[in-house]
């Protein structure tokens, strides 16, 4: 009788010990994100979170997202420490535009072969994003799936739940003719348009690590973490009558602003009110990208646009800039029955 080799899960490419080592590595940073409403710790089958008692009619708001092919660029450049911030930002910024306070966040990390150092760097970034937005990292899934991903390549996804008072939901229904639009400056391309970014790098033959732009490597501009606006916007909502907020993500100006506009209104954007950050000028020139396409693909230096009554503008700008935002008046809402919901002039 022939002896057969006894196979293990590790022989199949799944290292449970590495997974346990990762959990041990990240416990400390995850604990720092804990909110008082969270019950229990890491390791349970599910995460428990009570609703904050200050809400009379709490409405839960949820969102899920990834970071697109910015992740491919981060992997190629072996820079994993801020991609987790991007992941959180894409989710929590979508929640806060509806007036919601983020409560808790969960992540999904999938890879062909688990590298504990890489995964720890990514999840530490997620924890940092949670700290910046005031939400708890309550759990996640780390999936080692040999044969599904090439080597140590990985993908991440995030899921966030927040809460808003029912009477204070921001849905754009109050937007009206004469409202003023305020812009919040972005930190760069954030997490959108990176398939085009990578194509431009390929066609131009540019090495982002050696190409200098504004005194630092182009890679620093391209991998700058997505700005998290949660705390500034939540304070603004408390003190100013905000009618609508648009998060400029995939689809840029043309697709995201109309999502918060009522019928028979249009947003008129004053292009002279700001200058594009140099990274967008570089992308447009290196890729010979038409201006309309730039506004459809990238945020061009504008991370969020806020609509509010004209009398509130000065107060809003003072508050936002005092909180470290780069905020300015970017346009106005006008009555219109045109199918073109956004005009940039």
From Swiss-Prot:
Catalytic activity, reaction form: 2-formamido-N(1)-(5-O-phospho-beta-D-ribosyl)acetamidine + ATP = 5-amino-1-(5-phospho-beta-D-ribosyl)imidazole + ADP + phosphate + H(+)
Keyword Cytoplasm found: yes
Keywords, alphabetical: ATP-binding, Cytoplasm, Ligase, Nucleotide-binding, Purine biosynthesis
Top-level division of the source organism's lineage: Bacteria
One of the GO biological process terms: adenine biosynthetic process
Main location: cytoplasm
GO MF annotation list: ATP binding; phosphoribosylamine-glycine ligase activity; phosphoribosylformylglycinamidine cyclo-ligase activity
Top-level class of the enzyme under EC nomenclature: ligase
One GO term describing the cellular component: cytosol
Record flagged with keyword Cytoplasm: yes
Subcellular location: Cytoplasm
UniProt cross-references to SUPFAM superfamilies, sorted A to Z: PurM C-terminal domain-like, PurM N-terminal domain-like
Pathway(s) it belongs to: Purine metabolism; IMP biosynthesis via de novo pathway; 5-amino-1-(5-phospho-D-ribosyl)imidazole from N(2)-formyl-N(1)-(5-phospho-D-ribosyl)glycinamide: step 2/2
A Pfam family of this chain: AIRS
HAMAP family reported for this sequence: AIRS
Family: Belongs to the AIR synthase family.
Protein name: Phosphoribosylformylglycinamidine cyclo-ligase
Gene name, Swiss-Prot/TrEMBL: purM
């Amino acid at each position: 009788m022939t002896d057969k080799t006894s196979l293990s899960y590790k022989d199949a490419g799944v290292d449970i010990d590495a997974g346990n080592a990762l959990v041990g590595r990240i416990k400390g940073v995850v604990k720092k994100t804990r909110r008082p409403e969270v019950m229990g710790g890491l390791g349970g089958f599910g995460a428990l979170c009570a609703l904050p008692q200050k809400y009379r009619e709490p409405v839960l708001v949820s969102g899920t997202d990834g970071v697109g092919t910015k992740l491919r660029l981060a992997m190629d450049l072996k820079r994993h420490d801020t991609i987790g911030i991007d992941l959180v930002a894409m989710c929590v910024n979508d929640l806060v535009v509806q007036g919601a306070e983020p409560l808790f966040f969960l992540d999904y990390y999938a890879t062909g072969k688990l590298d504990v150092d890489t995964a720890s760097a990514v999840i530490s970034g997620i924890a940092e994003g949670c700290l910046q937005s005031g939400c708890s990292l309550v759990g996640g899934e780390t999936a080692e799936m040999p044969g599904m991903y090439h080597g140590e390549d990985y993908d991440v996804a995030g899921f966030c739940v927040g809460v808003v008072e029912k009477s204070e939901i921001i849905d754009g229904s109050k937007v009206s003719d004469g409202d003023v639009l305020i812009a919040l400056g972005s930190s760069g391309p954030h997490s959108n348009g990176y398939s085009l970014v990578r194509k431009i790098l390929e066609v131009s033959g540019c090495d982002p690590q050696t190409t200098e732009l504004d005194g630092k490597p182009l890679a620093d501009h391209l991998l700058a973490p997505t700005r998290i606006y949660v705390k500034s916007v939540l304070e603004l909502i408390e003190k100013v009558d905000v009618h609508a907020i648009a998060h400029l993500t995939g689809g840029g100006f043309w697709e995201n602003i109309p999502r918060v506009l009522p019928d028979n209104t249009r947003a008129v954007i004053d292009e002279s009110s700001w200058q594009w950050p140099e990274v967008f000028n570089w992308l447009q020139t290196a890729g010979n990208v038409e201006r309309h396409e730039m506004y459809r693909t990238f945020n061009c230096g504008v991370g969020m646009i806020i609509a509010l009554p004209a009398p509130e503008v000065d107060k809003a700008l003072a508050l936002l800039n005092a909180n470290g935002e780069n905020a300015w008046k970017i346009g106005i809402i006008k009555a219109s029955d045109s199918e073109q919901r956004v005009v940039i002039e």
